[in-house]
Amino acid sequence: MNMIVVNSYNEWDPLEEVIVGSVLGAGKMAFEPALSPFYPLNSEERSFHGAKVAEKEVMEAQEQLDNFAKVLENEGVIVRRPEVCDFCQPVKTPSFEVPFQNSSACPRDVLLVLGDEIIEAPMAQRARYFEYRAYRPLIKEYFRRGAKWTMAPKPTMSDELYTPNYSTENVYFDPVTHNSLTQFEPCFDAATFVRCGKDIFYQPDAVTNEFGAEWLQRHVGDRYRIHKMRFKDSHPEHLDTTLVPIRPGLVLTNPERPCLDGSIQLFKDNNWEVVDAPASIRSCLLYTSPSPRDAHES
């Protein structure tokens, strides 16, 4: 019998093995509908057609990731890296076309680990359609060593998935009244979900719709409970920038994004201490989108 090689249920257990990303071959995404929440309607970023990332920038970023990998290895953690791919190639499907892709810098966006299962997320950004390819050699290896492997339904990313002419310039994102995504098909980023054993928390955001969360809940059945949360954020993306469980009984929250629906009370009712993180000093440098805005309104 194969020894369990994938076995992760939460965000705080001692780390034994991890995938650290890579920016080799990175591209800069052209503007596309999934990026609408982040740029005003008349901004020049909406005319950005994508580009190859400058070699100097790639090397500087890769050096940081390599150093991070070394720190983990020095602590006894097994570090795996994605396969190098050329993300500067265009992508064309029957539903869309993009001139550049993204990178393999963020495995946490692509792969959701629930226990002994690896789920490839059905992400909503067109430029990331084939991002999973960088991780396939590792996933196949883990599968052969005993892990479960699931690929969520791949979204077509046709125009029906996105709200036309969407902007958060004057009205904040709202999952009911002002959502950038429709419920045309299920989609989510893995980083939208935060794991606490059998309890999984998420917030509908610019890359995750409720159809995606419904698919995940039905897929996992009664093995896990998926809880929807809502925080004040003009254009939310990924819950782990807002809520991070540190250990059983302690959860860190972003004071700039207070909970709007009372869902944080579930932690308090179960004797968890909810602590606000110190105020952040923002510095934004992204390879995944055009000249991003550097601030979330609070």
Regions found by a protein language model. Give the residues of each.
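The feature marks the mature, well-folded catalytic cores of soluble enzymes
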Residues: 1-289, 293
